[in-house]
Amino acid sequence: MPLFKLPAEEKQIDDAMRNFAEKVFASEVKDEGGRQEISPFDVDEICPISHHEMQAHIFHLETLSTSTEARRKKRFQGRKTVNLSIPLSETSSTKLSHIDEYISSSPTYQTVPDFQRVQITGDYASGVTVEDFEIVCKGLYRALCIREKYMQKSFQRFPKTPSKYLRNIDGEAWVANESFYPVFTPPVKKGEDPFRTDNLPENLGYHLKMKDGVVYVYPNEAAVSKDEPKPLPYPNLDTFLDDMNFLLALIAQGPVKTYTHRRLKFLSSKFQVHQMLNEMDELKELKNNPHRDFYNCRKVDTHIHAAACMNQKHLLRFIKKSYQIDADRVVYSTKEKNLTLKELFAKLKMHPYDLTVDSLDVHAGRQTFQRFDKFNDKYNPVGASELRDLYLKTDNYINGEYFATIIKEVGADLVEAKYQHAEPRLSIYGRSPDEWSKLSSWFVCNRIHCPNMTWMIQVPRIYDVFRSKNFLPHFGKMLENIFMPVFEATINPQADPELSVFLKHITGFDSVDDESKHSGHMFSSKSPKPQEWTLEKNPSYTYYAYYMYANIMVLNSLRKERGMNTFLFRPHCGEAGALTHLMTAFMIADDISHGLNLKKSPVLQYLFFLAQIPIAMSPLSNNSLFLEYAKNPFLDFLQKGLMISLSTDDPMQFHFTKEPLMEEYAIAAQVFKLSTCDMCEVARNSVLQCGISHEEKVKFLGDNYLEEGPAGNDIRRTNVAQIRMAYRYETWCYELNLIAEGLKSTE
């Protein structure tokens, strides 16, 4: 039996909890834009007034306590120095390995040089009472269990180390289970056609039906009439809402905020001491590592949009080149007539020869700060939507030929650079069901394949725009247009071979739009079902995210059953808006892009650290839109040990050079004074985060890259010092073990 289980009645969140969660949501949404900017404190705990109030509160609890001798003994035991155990190598699949007392001895690794460790003695739970510490540990434990559950159901990633600790807390044996891992398409072999269709699986003829926003799979028509779907893991909305309300309450609890804030401050300070003591030893490791430096270790642009994957000079050069070659070619169609390229520019009253990067006006500047609407206008070269349709769209008069050529040129630059990869996003809007067919036809017909690129699908959250123009009757139709064609291609791949081949190259789904737009709607059991959402108002971020996740979960189970590649859910999150966005992502997203607002919530930031959720940060993009570069939390997150990578977002708007990813690294290195080891660690994180295949990750990171800590690092390929990897792993285990120690005291 597990050592610690929540009682059955606690699992069902009562009305009081739900009401509390609604109050928390309301307080997060109210004055969202201004409150945090006006406050001089990143988190409330830094405020000296609240600090003194907390100390007085703790003293009051201590003086009023009339506990028995047993309680005083338990309190004393909780306040003495605790020697924490850290799992090292896996000596057994059923038991966590331990070391001698943490303070008197240090862990040793065969491949890690000796280095100086930071040792903390004294009260590990200082600042909170023992009772509060137990409450905190219970809450963090359950939060990690919630994430683990949603990741495993959808074949997304959850690290081994916290999973081991969770099983240890439960009193259960941890067993490695690779069946929960995502499946990516292997790399194309030399001489193999990446668009071959002769190896597609056979059609199954299953029936599909969307019910309450989720696609259900039925073996035959009779099963549809009886409502007996195939036994796939379908989502449970009530359970999701209960879990969401629990997390809403958790991130608002005072003791949890105090404890997590103190732990994060400790992590930051500990890293700075580690750097001061071991920076030269890390550098010595890297200097002794032959044929590997920052330039030739693999790095992936984990967040980039295909429509802006080129820099402004590249786009300008291509426009001029196309005019030289295709001036008399019919390239554009209006209601009146078809236009040649020459006639189109004449209609716009301009000549390509006269264009400059300034007149092209696609670069974000001071005018776009806090103005996402103006930023979207930058996608129109020279402010002309006709040029955007011609050069940056897949569905136009020339079938997206120019856009395909630009992407191929960007891919050729990546191949030439050799050690850089990218994950461009292509858009599916959900306006009509034939979008998938058109996009896959564009992809296959133009033979868009690059060994240094993997692809993702982004879904803009613009239902309100389509509904106001009467393109869609309800939100359920948008979900149907997004997911039904993918399910059909999974069940009957030979019916649409182009889409089936295209899906092999897709690794995940992204949810994109301006997060600072508030919907004011809290997702609850009272929310309309997707087919009932006929309002012109946009659903909330959580509403979008849940139904995307729910369909991806069912889709992944079906594709895994068929031996096909699966998809990850990797949304934009935390760039702006309410903290509920990040809370939702913690539950159901494999990884996120941006994550700036984590600095406003110590609880969520600490949970992201414990679960090692990857975050693709884009400081140059944020600098033009939401946050000045010097205030970016990138360095703070890196020091604390969050799993962050660098990405470009939109090179056309934010970068100047031919290698925008290197530009991103170079500026971060200069502004934040990053060491070579820091940059290589971020690069290694990007490869772990991305959707390239297992075979390629083995080649880029080493045979044991799935192992966590120094055992999974091959310095010959990653150029990350083993000292750094050992420090990260031991610090991570220390924090996880604190939770385990806190729960032991409840027995």
Curated annotation (Swiss-Prot):
Give the active-site positions: 594
Family, according to the entry, reads as follows:
Belongs to the metallo-dependent hydrolases superfamily. Adenosine and AMP deaminases family.
Q: Which cofactor does it need?
A: Zn(2+)
Q: What is the lineage of its organism?
A: Eukaryota, Metazoa, Chordata, Craniata, Vertebrata
* The protein, known as: AMP deaminase 1
From the UniProt record, give one GO term of the biological process aspect: GMP salvage
Q: Where does substrate bind?
A: 305, 374-379, 575, 650-653
Q: Which residues carry this modification: Phosphoserine?
A: 85, 441
MF (Gene Ontology):
AMP deaminase activity; identical protein binding; metal ion binding
E.C. number: 3.5.4.6
Please provide the record's keywords in A-Z order: Disease variant, Hydrolase, Metal-binding, Nucleotide metabolism, Phosphoprotein, Zinc
Q: Which domain of life is it from?
A: Eukaryota
Broadest EC class? hydrolase
Which NCBIfam families does the UniProt entry name for this protein? AMP_deaminase (TIGR01429)
